[in-house]
């Protein structure tokens, strides 16, 4: 399956208060910076506590994910299928098609987990979970439900559009670089100083490194 959108999740930033937008904006800038050397055209934007990367035309999937995994502040990178809201019956067909293409081996367990950010949607999260799960079971009787430890956790986020994903690639975590103070790092020649630099950069500190040649 070819993905043209990534949904990016952040962690600690979500705990911020009225200044959360500053951290989100910094993270968007870092994502754009990380993708500037990747072949392809990317539109990075934020909406409703999520950051999205829309990939226009051809791009290198593996290279894109590799660069995103290095961005401090991201805890999850989700390749998503973005769907227009054409009604629930169409959504069920799209979900069945997604499961069929993503998981040719149907000897799996699954769970549907939905998030209804669009409160005007006619079904609540529990109804979405049950009805989509029923559609999958009707289409593939060999698939089983496991709500505790499923092989596949199928996420459905209902917003202005509908986002479907079942992969969450781990991110670097931490805070975006530039959201804390600056610091100087003395590179002594051992392994401890670059490790310390990595750990403090992960807290959002912008580092300038110094090395004395003797």
Segments and roles (model prediction):
Residues 1-184, 194-214:
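RNA-binding accessory domains that recognize and position tRNA/RNA substrates
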Residues 190:
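Conserved G/P- and acidic residue-centered "switch" motifs that form tight phosphate/ATP-binding loops
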């Amino acid at each position: 399956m070819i993905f043209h959108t990534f949904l990016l999740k952040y962690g600690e930033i979500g705990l911020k208060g009225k200044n959360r937008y500053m951290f989100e904006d910094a993270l968007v800038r870092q994502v754009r910076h990380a993708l500037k050397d990747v072949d392809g055209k990317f539109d990075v934007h934020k909406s409703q506590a999520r950051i999205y990367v829309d990939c226009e035309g051809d791009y290198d999937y593996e290279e894109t994910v590799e660069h995103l995994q290095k961005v401090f502040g991201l805890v999850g990178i989700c390749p998503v299928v973005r769907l227009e809201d054409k009604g629930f019956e169409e959504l069920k067909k799209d979900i069945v098609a997604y499961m069929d293409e993503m998981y040719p081996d149907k000897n799996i367990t699954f769970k549907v987990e939905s998030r209804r950010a669009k409160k005007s949607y006619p079904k609540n999260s529990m109804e979405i979970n049950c009805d989509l799960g029923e559609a999958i079971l009707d289409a593939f009787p060999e698939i089983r439900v496991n709500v505790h430890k499923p092989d596949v956790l199928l996420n459905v986020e209902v917003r202005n559009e509908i986002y479907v994903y079942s992969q969450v690639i781990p991110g670097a975590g931490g805070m975006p670089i530039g959201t804390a103070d600056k610091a100087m790092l003395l590179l002594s020649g051992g392994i401890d100083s670059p490790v310390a630099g990595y750990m403090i950069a992960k807290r959002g500190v912008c580092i300038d490194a110094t090395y004395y040649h003797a």
